[in-house]
């Protein structure tokens, strides 16, 4: 993609109201309102993979004690997360860690575009929450196209390393444990 081209995956765009009931915007407004007065140690942001974490024991056992907030929305792609974070979801909180897991729903976008969208989200988080550690989780292997999944991981790892090499607050991982200071287990 040339520098003059617009990347749809990195252009903040409200989510599509597929149910026709305003659910997406209502959920966004709930996140903005719910974050006021909260002091989360961890913020999870992303699509349905993040949203569904509430249903698992690991959330209750590990993340609830950290006063974690879950800003996952089913169906969201990178451009939707970028819009939500640009429009108030980060305004009232200062988490120590932001966990980002998104990209699965970027149908029709190239690996380069999806990577650009993820990097735009990481940059926005850095700008709005400069003290937060950002953890970008790896991608699930897309059943329909394993080659695209692998290319996406390689592209984002390469671009991410080039763009954030001097910043110790960002890590992309395939679900390895990352401790404070960047130590990987």
Tell where the protein language model's regions lie, with residue ranges.
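N-terminal secretory targeting modules
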Residues: 1-45, 49-61, 174-176
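Short, mixed-charge, low-aromatic patches
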Residues: 35-43, 74-78, 113-116
């Amino acid at each position: 993609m040339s520098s003059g081209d617009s990347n749809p995956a990195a252009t903040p765009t409200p989510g599509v109201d597929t149910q026709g009931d305003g659910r997406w915007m209502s959920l966004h407004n709930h996140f903005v309102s719910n974050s006021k007065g909260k002091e989360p140690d961890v913020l999870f942001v992303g699509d349905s993979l993040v949203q569904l974490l509430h249903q698992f024991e690991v959330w209750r056992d590990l993340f609830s004690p950290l006063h974690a907030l879950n800003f996952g929305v089913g169906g969201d792609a990178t451009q939707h997360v970028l819009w939500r974070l640009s429009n108030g979801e980060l305004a009232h909180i200062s988490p120590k860690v932001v966990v980002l897991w998104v990209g699965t729903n970027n149908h029709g976008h190239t690996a380069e575009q999806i990577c650009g969208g993820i990097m735009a989200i990481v940059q926005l988080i850095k700008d709005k929450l400069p003290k937060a550690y950002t953890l970008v989780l790896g991608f699930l292997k897309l059943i329909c196209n394993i080659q695209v999944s692998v290319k996406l991981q390689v592209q984002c790892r390469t671009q991410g390393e080039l763009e954030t090499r001097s910043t110790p607050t960002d890590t992309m991982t395939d679900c390895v444990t990352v401790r404070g200071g960047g130590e990987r287990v």
